[in-house]
Amino acid sequence: MAREFSLEKTRNIGIMAHIDAGKTTTTERILFYTGRIHKIGETHEGASQMDWMEQEQERGITITSAATTAQWKGYRVNIIDTPGHVDFTVEVERSLRVLDGAVAVLDAQSGVEPQTETVWRQATTYGVPRVVFVNKMDKIGADFLYSVGTLHERLAANAHPIQLPIGAEDTFEGIIDLIEMNALYYEDDLGNDPHIKEIPADLKDLADEYRGKLVEAVAELDEELMMKYLEGEEITKEELKAGIRKGTLNVEFYPVVCGTAFKNKGVQPMLDAVLDYLPAPTDVPAINGVLPDGEEAARHADDSEPFSSLAFKVMTDPYVGRLTFFRVYSGTLNSGSYVQNSTKGKRERVGRILQMHANHREEISIVYAGDIAAAVGLKDTTTGDTLCDEKEQIILESMEFPEPVIQVAIEPKSKADQDKMGQALAKLAEEDPTFRAETDQETGQTLISGMGELHLDILVDRMRREFRVEANVGDPQVSYRETFRKSAQVEGKFVRQSGGRGQYGHVWIEFGPNEEGKGFEFENAIVGGVVPREYIPAVQAGLEGALDNGVLAGYPLIDIKAKLYDGSYHDVDSNEMAFKVAASMALRNAAKKCDPVILEPMMAVEVVIPEEYLGDIMGNITSRRGRVDGMEARGNAQVVRAFVPLANMFGYATHLRSGTQGRGVYTMQFDHYEEVPKSIAEEIIKANGGNNKED
């Protein structure tokens, strides 16, 4: 089967924005105008095509990026809808990784918002060219030029309008095209047939001014155009479009368009801008990878090259089971064929290949370079894995995901839920690399960890809906540790005599602090067999077992040394068990002599805020027992780096949001352990009922 759309006529784009800027509605309208939907679904009525998880429809937010394919003016446009909430940055990161270009949607009233800044930075990291769509021009307070100004101030972006709105709020009726220098009026409700007219007289001067600014900005990026511009020659329409395309592809220029997706105005010209200015797979640099012999190699967007692709999302579908979304970088793949998962070193069979249209799917027999599709039948492939030709193997650059930062205990409500919960957690962890589930060795509780409170809420909710598992969720917890600050020699003696054979184990151990991060080190310094050699492993095992349940508040002991140097034994009564118990008693006794302390996880926190909030934010970090480690200006924002105890970071997202009118963002990850101040340590010990008791 021949290719339906050439590579040059393929666009892989993401729609990215702050939560509530109208991203999903914009995608809906694209699907409507490109003929994939016959009835428009509204997000605020909970009937949107892209938001197909029940929860997304209820909350009106997009959680998973659904990939959809559409056609416009002889081009194929593959669209990935990305979430706008900070807890789902992993979804945004992984979509950006496989896209060639993006449409950044802004709310015309707010302009650039905090999450826009986060997503914009991620897109810049991946070198993704962007077109900006200023949406909601019909909203009260909509201000197009203010929104464009925020692109300059908050993102230091070289963004310029290629359109101007005609009217705003209730009177928004069309747009001025600054390249064609004409006006488009929307007169029917569905916006199917805009009328082309002359630019209204009262806006002619403004249009001329912004056309002049556009020409100047484009000329600055191109020497030939600059020469023409300086010599006063006319720059043609074609030259202007070519200049905008070149600047956009080089991520040096961002064309800005406007409209209102909800009222069906301005969506088709935005689609035209996607075709005109965003890259085809052939316009972006070839993807790099590593061959089995360690050599670096590139794969170009070309059907004749060996097949290579990247799995960027795994989902469980109620009808077809496990779906693996993948982006083809080179070559072709037929359904039913075998591929190599070079990341895991496993052979996989691609059962069927589906092209996704929001929630409806169509089966296809072959995919080509530049395509985005979903495979059914892959068993071992997870997010970030490379799938490639078995004979021409390569591992493509993968994605890096942050470590989870928040942990809660979860327990099934009934015995029936118990087994199902394990399976559900395993499935969710497979789909989401920033989610972990593990069993706490000390309490036997199941702990789940993720990127934030909303992230975990949604996952627990999905467990209930998709896997029918009811669970109780505890409060967020901190994983404390314990260690020793001093060295001391301690005795442990276990003697039981109760008729017949007794128990006898006796050791002298020197305990002391170890270097940070070195863990537990055991040294056998017994001379002359005072403790027989066969009991030494039992002493070590007894200590290791006792470490998990510390001496102050029951938290694991880390970074300590133990040197076994003396002891005694009994010919008949000594056995492994007795020496195990003696060793653990020695560790308990060390609590009195070795100055044990509690350690807490310290997070490396980075807060990005507008300058005017700097004083308040610094004060708040100090009040949370944080230490500011450094500051720098980024664009017109301030970046504050600090170390803050995890225990004091709960609820910080809410505080930051309200304290900066939603303009501050922060990231945090675990950095190191540090001693807890005495007063707080006492509270922790009290809360845990104290562990320093005689055995």
Curated annotation (Swiss-Prot):
One of its GO terms (molecular function) is GTP binding. Catalyzes the GTP-dependent ribosomal translocation step during translation elongation. During this step, the ribosome changes from the pre-translocational (PRE) to the post-translocational (POST) state as the newly formed A-site-bound peptidyl-tRNA and P-site-bound deacylated tRNA move to the P and E sites, respectively. Catalyzes the coordinated movement of the two tRNA molecules, the mRNA and conformational changes in the ribosome. It holds the Pfam family GTP_EFTU. GTP binds at residues 17-24, 81-85, 135-138. Disulfide bonds: none annotated. Residues 8-282 form the tr-type G domain. This is Elongation factor G. It is found in: Cytoplasm. One of its GO terms (biological process) is ribosome disassembly. Keywords: Cytoplasm, Elongation factor, GTP-binding, Nucleotide-binding, Protein biosynthesis. GO terms for cellular component: cytoplasm. InterPro entries: EFG_II (IPR041095), EFG_III (IPR009022), EFG_III/V (IPR035647), EFG_IV (IPR047872), EFG_V (IPR035649), EFG_V-like (IPR000640), EFTu-like_2 (IPR004161), G_TR_CS (IPR031157). Belongs to the TRAFAC class translation factor GTPase superfamily. Classic translation factor GTPase family. EF-G/EF-2 subfamily. HAMAP family: EF_G_EF_2_B (MF_00054_B). The keyword Cytoplasm applies.
